[in-house]
Design a protein with these regions (language model features):
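Conserved alpha-helical scaffold segments that buttress catalytic/binding sites
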Residues: 2-290
Length: 290
């Protein structure tokens, strides 16, 4: 059985509550004096419709990072040389709109100081708060999403802020550029979504080199034989090597943020999914900011 560890009191960071890490940090990242990359968790699990457990993922990714080397041979960088701070998890209230606004406020403060952000989810809805915060500072932003599902519903189960509406809301913000890895459609996406849907290798050609870029990775975009521990698995999918090749092709762009979401640790007793998630974060930091 997957159970939550006994909690401890929250502390205040920048006026907002964050959950202390009790000495568990991503790759042992410490709080540094002048960090350039801000890593934090959003253990959001509010609108999941199939398998629960996304709230455990931020901590599980950190635990899995203990098995990951900090050096990336692919990108020739060691992320211990990156000014990286793991700030813990946002303390959530249970009100999705309010929680997203809290995330947006935190990220806005970091973005206004020129920081890059890495968010560990939590359900995919958390991405909306991060993007909202960055957009308030940069005004112009382009977002690329890897996902097995279109996430293009106007609302789902009566909710407009849902894991099933993420791409729809990003489209409403005017920031969505491309979505790759989709194998599941609800049938009502329409021509508008067809304009965003593309193959993974075609994503870079859609991007504006003059606009900052945010990359959101829903782990269910990957092949479930590699990542079974997700909330809504779909057959087929992207390989780990393909994601790394995407990282390589995006290095020429100004990547301002990255997230890895929808991990569901209780659904993968082997822990392999969380290791993949930790590796993606490590390689992403090395590729974009190393």
């Amino acid at each position: 059985m997957w159970v939550e560890r006994p909690g401890s009191r929250s502390f205040v960071f920048g006026g907002d509550e964050m959950q202390p890490l009790q000495h568990l940090r991503f790759l042992e990242a410490k709080k540094v004096g002048e960090p350039e990359v801000m890593l934090f968790g959003v253990p959001l699990e509010a609108t999941e419709s199939f398998r629960g457990g996304t709230r455990f993922a931020p901590r599980a990714i950190r635990e899995a990072s203990r098995s990951v080397e900090s050096y990336s041979r692919i990108f020739g960088k060691d992320i211990t040389q990156v000014p990286l701070a793991d700030l813990g998890d946002v303390v959530l209230s249970g009100d999705v709109a309010g929680d997203l606004e809290q995330v947006a406020g935190l990220v806005r403060g970091w973005a206004s100081d020129g920081k890059r952000v890495v968010m560990l989810g939590g359900e995919h809805t958390a991405t909306l708060g991060v993007v909202r915060g960055i957009l308030r500072v940069l005004n112009k932003l382009q977002v690329v999403v890897l996902d097995a599902h279109s996430d293009f519903r106007e609302e789902y189960l009566g909710l407009s802020l849902s894991h099933a509406t993420v791409c729809r809301r990003l489209c409403d913000m005017g920031v969505l550029v491309g979505v790759a890895g989709v194998r599941s459609f609800f049938g009502g996406e329409g021509e508008e979504f067809e304009g965003f849907l593309c193959q993974l290798e075609d994503l870079p050609s859609r991007l504006d080199p003059k606009r900052p870029l945010y990359l959101s990775i829903d782990l269910d975009a990957l092949d479930p034989s590699l990542c079974p521990g997700v909330s809504n698995p779909e057959p087929g999918g992207i390989s780990y090597a393909q994601v790394l090749e995407l990282f390589r092709s995006l290095r020429r762009f100004d990547v301002v943020g990255l997230d890895v979401v929808e991990g569901c640790p209780p659904c993968d007793p082997s822990g392999a999914t969380m290791v993949v998630a930790a590796k993606l974060v490590q390689e992403g930091i090395a590729a974009f900011w190393g």
